[in-house]
Amino acid sequence: MNLVKPLAAAPSVTQGPLPASRKVYKPGDIHPDIRVPMREIALHPTSGEPPVTVYDSSGPYTIENADIRIDAGLPRLRSDWVLKRGDVESYDGRAVKAEDNGFATGERLTPEFPVRNRPLRAKPGKAVTQLAYARAGIVTPEMEFIAIRENLGRKAAKEALARDGESFGASVPDFVTPEFVRQEVAAGRAIIPANINHPEAEPMIIGRNFLVKINANIGNSAVTSSMAEEVEKMVWATRWGADTVMDLSTGRNIHNIREWIIRNSPVPIGTVPLYQALEKVNGIAEDLSWEVFRDTLIEQAEQGVDYFTIHAGVRLHYIPLTVDRVTGIVSRGGSIMAKWCLHHHRESFLYEHFEDICDICRAYDVSFSLGDGLRPGSIADANDRAQFAELETLGELTKIAWAKDCQVMIEGPGHVPMHKIKENMDKQLAVCGEAPFYTLGPLTTDIAPGYDHITSGIGAAMIGWFGTAMLCYVTPKEHLGLPDRNDVKTGVITYKIAAHAADLAKGHPAARTRDDALSRARFEFRWEDQFNLSLDPETARNFHDETLPKEAHKVAHFCSMCGPKFCSMRISHDIRAEAQKEGLEAMAAKYRDGGDLYMPLDQSNAAPAGE
């Protein structure tokens, strides 16, 4: 480990627990040294209920009074796990070059991260991927960590749980065991994105037989943003529930900004290496080469990028299929490779060198996210020949990657109307061997710029129910501009709703716990518990307090929507109390004879005087 000259003042980020919450840790059994983080939400003492345990991806940032120093990075919790396997070696790594940061100099150059760690790679002939270990029958600490995390702290039930949902062929177990995690990874149905050079990340899994995950995109552009802003966006996104973060930076300082993000990220980080490679050739797509791209892959793998989006499915003879589209090729990576292919009139270097890319990924355990460069950018283009031709190629590439012990997920659309969404899921499962699907939405209509987090949230909930393993968020700024901090939160919350709705619909055994707890709090007028159990406690509280701001209103048996006389839940309480007093049968007879709820026909038809 080498130290670089520290910053005069390191940037600060959002810290502190969410309301009524505390971080708790569950130990491992196979690997007793692991500590799996979760969030406990305390309920009001009058509820008589235990705290509600929820999945937590926020890392140390939500620990009470945590000592966080961005210029030091997070604890390297997986380092010992990686080294104990005995199949890696440390080395000096490549030197940082001027082109790595877009030739930025002087005050325009983002400072280097103060700590340099020697990168690790596989020893010759070894594959250090979670897939290789799973196939060898090894239950890694990462796998046990994930099993505990997916169970949300639950113990195995003695009897089968009652299930309510339609899983469309998914096999979500009542209780996730480390062995189940191993089997799913070995079969290619799930991935654990965990680069050996990103030991700060807490292990998580992406697969349709697990909780639906969400990704948040961040990154600078040639126009705006800085290192401090991007690190804060990452912390902010994970605070609200992002399971992974993609750094899609396209401007200067890509290398240095990414280093700051990775060293401080408790979740896997993904990238599109093509973006940085393009910066290295001054933005001229035709000047891209395998040599430049290969160097970029190694650079990012050494830093600790956990998954690469690789647009290797854009083949030369597919490009003419996009000519008659309404919106052509909308993927940045797809359009870059299409331009390169047409200029050189040959298959892309990503396709021709795919096995070489696999060799790099298996040496660092970088997972593939096979990019959908020909995804539809409008509902008019959904499910067309170009889209599905590329998908079939991605299925072929998946088999090549699996043969090299590389982990793979498949990226999906895009813009798809509701009635065409399930066809996407069914076809992906069929042609890609059930590799995890990772979709951008899809957006279900094109008429709502400024509200595309909603148009896409609809599609995301549907395709998550049908089997998509991870949903890439869309913010209100989609198609309009670079999202800021508030947009990131809106996008994450929207997609947490979609993912959770999908888990409920699939019948995930732990999904309803939080819903039921909030519903009971709502019925019992426990306002503080309602706020604290929600995905966004601050917004829930603020909306309530806009009209009923006094502390006395936090125990009131009504809200400003109905007021005290028309609150349906208050009336339900009265009905329940009277029913318990007189007996249900007597109450039913009373109402049939013309009680408060049912009136005889002649009375109900009689108009009051004066009308």
Swiss-Prot record:
Q: Which reaction does it catalyse?
A: 5-amino-1-(5-phospho-beta-D-ribosyl)imidazole + S-adenosyl-L-methionine = 4-amino-2-methyl-5-(phosphooxymethyl)pyrimidine + CO + 5'-deoxyadenosine + formate + L-methionine + 3 H(+)
List residues binding [4Fe-4S] cluster.
559, 562, 567
Q: Pathway, per Swiss-Prot/TrEMBL?
A: Cofactor biosynthesis; thiamine diphosphate biosynthesis
What Gene Ontology molecular function terms does this protein carry?
4 iron, 4 sulfur cluster binding; carbon-carbon lyase activity; zinc ion binding
* Gene Ontology, cellular component aspect: cytosol
Question: Where would one find coiled-coil regions in this protein?
Answer: none
Free-text remark on how the cofactor is bound:
Binds 1 [4Fe-4S] cluster per subunit. The cluster is coordinated with 3 cysteines and an exchangeable S-adenosyl-L-methionine.
Names of required cofactors: [4Fe-4S] cluster
Task: Name the UniProt key words of this record, in alphabetical order.
Answer: 4Fe-4S, Iron, Iron-sulfur, Lyase, Metal-binding, Plasmid, S-adenosyl-L-methionine, Thiamine biosynthesis, Zinc
- The residues listed in the UniProt record as binding Zn(2+), with positions renumbered to this chain, are 415, 479
Q: State the function annotated in the UniProt record.
A: Catalyzes the synthesis of the hydroxymethylpyrimidine phosphate (HMP-P) moiety of thiamine from aminoimidazole ribotide (AIR) in a radical S-adenosyl-L-methionine (SAM)-dependent reaction.
Regarding protein family, the annotation reads: Belongs to the ThiC family.
> Under which name does UniProt file this protein?
Phosphomethylpyrimidine synthase
